Amino acid sequence: MQRTLKSLTVAAGLALAVGGASYATSPAHAGTPKNMMVMAMSISDLITLDPAEVFEFTGGEVIANVYDRVMMFEAENLTTLVGGVAESYEVSKDGKTVTLSIRPGQKFHSGNPVRAEDVAFSLRRVIKLKKTPSFIFTQFGWNKDNVDSLIKPVGGKVSITINADFSPALMLNALSAGVGSVVDEKLVMSHEKDGDLGYGWLKNHSAGSGPFSLKTWKSNELVMLEANPSYRHGGPKMSRVVLRHVPEPSAQRLLIEKGDADIARNLTPDQVNGVAGNADLVVDNNPKAALVYIASNNAHPILSKPKVRQ
């Protein structure tokens, strides 16, 4: 079975693809340059920008804008899987092997072309580094000893073999996760030290092909992203986006009311209601993907029953 995928076209039209929930925006851009967007938000959870390691909310948002992933979801419909770096795929009759065709003409921020070799390198690298989010891939039976033989670039395509009892549909969905981000192998490996696959360098730099590149990251201070005018869907509307570390929601509200920030990301429900009547501000609501953990006391005679958990 061969499937040709629709390409994601939304990201370039937005200033930045952000997570969901409610946030307040200032349409006037009073105190900020017209070609730059400033977000007031907490970035205290940002500890790395290597897509093989990122597993926090802020880092996830940053790499979603810096890297294209093998597969992606429609921004306006998070149930629709679309093509990212891959433009089509073919599934073998036994359902064990998926062959990805890589979209031609894509370029990294460095100017290097996006190749099938980059895709294979990026996926293998996640397994070999074995950072926290690698479990998203290891469930498919991939490990450092077999991944080179199970994920292979072949003539502009990438062959991926599943080594466990999982549907290829689940694997394709997994390729839309942060670990599915495609990194520039040539650039990353030029910074390799002691066999670290460029990990020490990529924690604080970027090597992607997305609508933005990383210009600056100062821990617990700011992240500055710069538009990629050569992005495959066209350059973003904003030349720069700044994520300014403002941990206190009250300070975020003050900045947006003064026009010193364009978006406040972490307002409390009461604060959102408080600014809703301000004619100079807009409160936006967007869907947000989230994990919900439910814990139960299995020592309880009722809760211990399997049918309750089912």
Predicted regions and their residues:
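Ligand-site clamp/hinge motif
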Residues: G200, N228-G274, A289
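Short, well-ordered beta-strand elements
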Residues: K34-I43, E87, T97-L100, V119-L123, ...
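Surface-exposed binding/hinge segments that line
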Residues: S101, T138-H191
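Gly/Pro-rich hinge or "lid" segments in bacterial periplasmic/extracellular proteins
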Residues: E74-E76, A177-P236, R240
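Alpha-helical secondary-structure segments
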Residues: V38, R115-S122, G155-T161, G210-P211, ...
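N-terminal lobe/hinge region of extracytoplasmic solute-binding protein
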Residues: A40-K93, R124, H205-S209
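Aromatic- and charge-enriched surface segment that lines or borders ligand/interaction sites
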Residues: E87-P133, S159-T161, L255, I302-S304
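Ligand-binding "clamshell"
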Residues: N35, N273-N285
